[in-house]
């Protein structure tokens, strides 16, 4: 495979400076370019802006948009190099106006008056084609024909945590949580599993399987097929956990402008706290966080739009709980774009002994720039529901209105017929930078039943509490059944430059058959004063018993720098302070220091000192996170006069593939196995703690499905003798794919040899160095220094002295090469 190495590039640049002689010289390409073994290329003009003949793996760009990686064979006359009509079609270039008899078109022909340029150093070919002849793509979007299925592999992403607290007044408390997100990818199919284990104190631990399904994406349908245990969509009906089959349009296969929103969970921890997020009765996220504001944006939710129950357990044992609504305004689709979702199976609701078979279908269609219609049906034994709705894209924002009719007949013969109506609103006012997001109001009549209501009504005498859960799924029937009105909204406003931003969110609910209502309001203001950032936050909550809770928080963060990034690395340490007030006045204060250290920024640390007004208690704490190449390890400790608290966790990933078993410090749903044989300690995409192992392999997660993912290796901190030939690659995987990205390397041992001719003169710069078989293994550099690469020490090498007269000399070695010695070429 033809490859230009960094050293060869430098040598070529030097050779071009001797244009009068070198332009007509003959050079072997094996060493300088790294391919084409045993081939000689004659009369190559090195000053021409053309690649040498051979086969290349090239990233092709059309009008600066990546269109995929292709094998191109450059002919002896580069002007005759051509591409087939099939490749041209995949590039998105219209070839209808070309002569029908031509099946392979030269570059000059296909650019149709435009231009093309090579950049062999990074294996890139750019075509500039008149826009009228190009199928335009949204920035970052990749056509389906360039999506990669990936390789066969087994993987698991794990998280293990242990939390311990010891209170003088009440004794100790222990909790264990383990979660595995695993997958088996085989022949383009993917088996996904999400399982967890929870244990508190002396209660027996409980294993739960949240999801287990087989999946495959289909580019022709722009959709995904799943079979197994999973959740239905929440776009039209409430999400239902079930066992069966589901076929749906994967909106991420479409350009970015048609993507869905994802929830964001945020709050403020007063100490080293344990944040637990539950959905549908399953713990979907648990993490220890240091004192101060936290924001969780990497949730992997299987349950669609079910609300999130969040609990923050502080070091002193106090627990704050709140609800994060998870509902979205139905997508306003582009004209002619549709979204479908079909599901059939049997409900698999946790804790319910009586389940029900059902079929669900949903469909959305964008008629024009103003109107999107949608509808759906849910049919089961003794239950049905139908929904019709419309979304309008108006000048005052996106508005959707829908109505649902339900019929439920319970096992005891009771019949309930009801209706539910919803109005949702979403708007961004660009002139004022105001965003109204997910403002939604829903009213349900007394006898309206969701499918979850229907199933739980038939199980209301059988459910039991799971002591391992903060909010058990059984609490659904007691707390959420019979919802009457529900209103949620959030607004954010960017103020004029220098004035910061403000956000407001609210949630209000009431229920049939219950007096009172629950209300929750949150208001925050954030800004920066030079380098100092601060946030003012206020919240007010009312429960159904008219109990009111108010909180006000002031958070300040100040960065301090040291190091000049030359003699010492530049570092930052942050000093923060968080003060909270409640109905009684001052409640707590926390002061902390945090930062990052390590040669590869692999350690994050924090220390804090907090004081609680209640009990007049002062607590000291510390936390440390180690981002190792093979795992992420975290530990925390807090102590006061009345309690001690400690927590530890380890997370990471294990990947088994044909090249072996590799460890990663984290693993997401879609990831890459980057393979650079012989290159050790090279880091990926600027993440210095994520490095290649001794075999040159590193796992890189965070790949975006169906999009360009740029992968780069940095060898500046690597002392490997192997040479990396091109450090950048691009991949566009299917969702859930494990993509193998191979980097070309030269693992032959490098030698630097000092040598002179027998008459004491220097050898000619730029001449080849050949082994005893006549194969090129190196070149003469400046100062009569030879650079060669070999798998083993050669008995001797030959160097040309005068090519026109065919004169050469030989350097003889012993069993080893002494790089400190001056050799004589005789």
UniProtKB/Swiss-Prot annotation:
Q: Where in the cell is it found?
A: Cell outer membrane
Signal peptide residues are 1-22
- Say if the entry is tagged with keyword Disulfide bond: yes
The record, for Gene3D superfamilies, names: 2.60.40.2070, 2.60.40.3110, 3.10.20.410, Outer membrane usher protein FimD, plug domain
Induction summary: Expression is negatively regulated by H-NS and subjected to cAMP receptor protein (CRP)-mediated catabolite repression.
> How is this protein positioned relative to the membrane?
Multi-pass membrane protein
Following inactivation of the gene, the phenotype reported is: Deletion of the operon under classical laboratory conditions does not result in any major effect on E.coli capacity to form biofilms compared with the wild-type strain.
Tell me if Phosphoprotein is a UniProt keyword of this record. no
Keywords from UniProt, A to Z, are:
Cell outer membrane, Disulfide bond, Fimbrium biogenesis, Membrane, Signal, Transmembrane, Transmembrane beta strand, Transport
SUPFAM superfamilies associated with the record: FimD N-terminal domain-like (SSF141729)
Q: Name one GO molecular function term.
A: fimbrial usher porin activity
Give disulfide pairs as residue numbers. Answer: 809-825
Q: Which Pfam families match?
A: PapC_C, PapC_N, Usher
**Which BP terms from GO are recorded?**
DNA damage response; pilus assembly
Which GO cellular component terms are attached? cell outer membrane
Q: Which family does it belong to?
A: Belongs to the fimbrial export usher family.
PANTHER family, per this entry?
Answer: OUTER MEMBRANE USHER PROTEIN, OUTER MEMBRANE USHER PROTEIN HTRE-RELATED
Biological role: Part of the yehABCD fimbrial operon. Could contribute to adhesion to various surfaces in specific environmental niches. Probably involved in the export and assembly of fimbrial subunits across the outer membrane.
Extra info from the record? Answer: The operon is cryptic under classical laboratory conditions, but is functional when constitutively expressed.
The protein, known as: Outer membrane usher protein YehB
Protein's organism: Escherichia coli (strain K12)
């Amino acid at each position: 495979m033809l490859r230009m190495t960094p050293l060869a590039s430098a040598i070529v640049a030097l050779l071009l400076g001797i244009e009068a002689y070198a332009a007509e010289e003959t050079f072997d390409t094996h060493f300088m370019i790294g391919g084409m073994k045993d081939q000689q290329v004659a009369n190559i003009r090195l000053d021409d802006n053309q690649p040498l003949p051979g086969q290349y793996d090239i990233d092709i760009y059309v009008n600066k948009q990546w269109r995929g990686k292709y094998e191109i064979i450059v002919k002896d006359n580069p002007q005759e190099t051509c591409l087939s009509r099939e490749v041209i079609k995949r590039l998105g270039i219209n070839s209808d106006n070309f002569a029908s008899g031509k099946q392979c078109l030269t570059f000059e022909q296909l650019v149709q008056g435009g231009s093309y340029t090579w950049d062999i150093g990074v294996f890139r070919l750019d075509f500039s084609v008149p826009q009228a002849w190009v199928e335009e793509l949204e920035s970052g979007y990749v056509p389906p024909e360039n999506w990669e299925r990936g390789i066969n592999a087994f993987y698991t992403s794990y998280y293990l945590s242990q939390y311990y607290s010891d209170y003088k007044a009440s004794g100790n408390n222990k909790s264990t949580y383990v979660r595995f997100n695993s997958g088996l990818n085989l022949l383009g199919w993917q088996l996904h599993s999400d399982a967890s284990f929870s244990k508190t104190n002396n209660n027996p631990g409980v294993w739960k399987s949240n999801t287990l399904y087989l999946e495959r994406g289909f580019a022709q349908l722009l959709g995904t097929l799943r079979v197994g245990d999973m959740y239905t969509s929440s776009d039209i009906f409430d999400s239902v956990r079930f066992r069966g089959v589901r076929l749906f349009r994967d909106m991420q296969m479409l350009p970015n402008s048609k993507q869905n929103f994802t929830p964001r969970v945020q709050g403020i921890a007063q100490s080293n706290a344990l944040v637990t997020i539950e959905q549908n009765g399953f713990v979907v996220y648990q993490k220890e966080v240091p004192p101060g504001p936290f924001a969780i944006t990497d949730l992997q939710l299987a349950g669609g739009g079910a609300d999130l129950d969040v609990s923050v357990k502080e070091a002193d044992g106090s627990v704050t709980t709140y609800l994060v609504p998870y509902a979205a305004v139905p997508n306003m689709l582009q004209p002619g774009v549709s979204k479908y979702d079909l599901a059939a199976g049997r409900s698999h609701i946790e804790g319910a002994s009586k389940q029900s078979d059902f079929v669900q279908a949903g469909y959305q269609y964008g008629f024009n720039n103003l109107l999107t219609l949608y509808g759906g049906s849910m049919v089961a034994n003794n239950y049905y529901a139908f929904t019709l709705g419309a979304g309008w894209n108006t000048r005052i924002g996106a508005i959707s209105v829908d109505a649902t009719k339900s019929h439920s007949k319970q096992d005891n013969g009771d019949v309930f017929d009801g209706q539910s109506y919803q109005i949702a609103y979403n708007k961004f006012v660009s002139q004022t930078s105001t965003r109204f997001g997910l403002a939604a109001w829903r009213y349900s009549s007394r006898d309206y039943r969701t499918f979850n209501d229907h199933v739980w009504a038939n199980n209301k005498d059988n459910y039991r509490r799971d002591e391992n859960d903060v909010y058990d799924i059984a609490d659904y029937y007691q707390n959420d059944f019979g919802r009457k009105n529900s209103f949620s909204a959030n607004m954010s406003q960017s103020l004029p430059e220098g004035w910061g931003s403000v956000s407001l969110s609210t949630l209000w609910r009431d229920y049939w058959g219950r007096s009172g209502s629950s209300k929750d309001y949150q208001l925050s203001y954030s800004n920066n004063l030079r380098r100092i950032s601060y946030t003012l936050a206020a919240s007010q909550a009312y429960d159904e018993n008219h109990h009111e809770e108010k909180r006000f928080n002031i958070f300040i963060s100040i960065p301090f720098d040291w190091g000049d990034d030359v003699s010492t690395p530049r570092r930052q340490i942050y000093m923060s302070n968080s003060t909270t007030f409640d109905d009684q006045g001052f409640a707590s204060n926390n002061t902390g220091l945090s930062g990052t250290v390590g040669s590869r920024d692999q350690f994050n640390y924090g220390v804090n000192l907090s004081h609680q007004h209640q009990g007049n208690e002062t607590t000291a704490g510390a936390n440390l996170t180690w981002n190792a190449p093979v795992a992420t390890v975290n530990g925390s400790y807090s102590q006061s006069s009345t309690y001690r608290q400690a927590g530890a966790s380890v997370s990471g990933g294990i990947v088994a593939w044909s090249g072996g078993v590799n460890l990663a410090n984290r693993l997401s749903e879609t990831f890459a196995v980057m393979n650079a044989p012989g290159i050790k300690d090279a880091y990926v995409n600027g993440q210095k703690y994520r490095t290649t192992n001794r075999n040159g392999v590193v796992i890189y997660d965070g790949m975006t499905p169906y999009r360009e993912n740029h992968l780069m290796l940095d060898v500046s901190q690597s002392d490997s003798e192997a040479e990396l030939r091109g450090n950048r690659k691009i991949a566009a995987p299917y969702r859930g794919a494990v993509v193998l990205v191979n980097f070309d390397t030269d693992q032959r041992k490098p030698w630097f040899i000092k040598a002179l001719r027998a008459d004491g003169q220097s050898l000619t710069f730029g001449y080849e160095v050949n082994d005893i078989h006549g194969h090129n293994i190196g070149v003469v550099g400046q100062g009569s220094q030879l650079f060669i690469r070999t798998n083993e020490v050669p008995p001797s090498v030959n160097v040309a002295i005068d090519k026109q007269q065919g004169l050469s000399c030989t350097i003889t070695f012993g069993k080893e090469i002494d790089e400190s010695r001056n050799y004589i070429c005789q």
